[in-house]
Amino acid sequence: MSQGSAPFWETTPLAQMSQAQWESLCDGCGRCCLHKLEDEDTGEIYHTAVACRLLDLETCRCSDYAHRKQRVPDCIQLTPADIPAFHWLPPSCAYRRVAEGRGLAPWHPLVSGDPDSVHRAGVSVRGRVVSEDEGDPLETRIVVWPGRDV
């Protein structure tokens, strides 16, 4: 970014971003990789502290990103076409923030220049979740914090 020019997330609509720009918006918090439950009657989404088995609980990144859809068929791959449905993403999510015109948070790696800032700010799931491989019933692991803005 040259001095005086606005960053791409402030000038380029989500639907017009390059693949590299789109991917770089992910802050690496891991919240979208947590299992969620939906109330059949109200449609309300409940977050759990149970992560997809492919989520590396230390780095908060997918351990097999290139093949995640083959290994986890119900993995949700975010694309610009999904923008109208971003309401299920945590309010802190960069995709949702940009879609809502709120810009990136100060702790976002694109703003801070530090990929670990998301962890230091307490936004990531690091140290707060278990893998689905532990076998706990999701209903026993419902938590509120992933759905809160930070």
UniProtKB/Swiss-Prot annotation:
Protein name in UniProt: UPF0260 protein Tgr7_0887
Recorded family membership: Belongs to the UPF0260 family.
Superkingdom per UniProt: Bacteria
Pfam families linked: CxxCxxCC (PF03692)
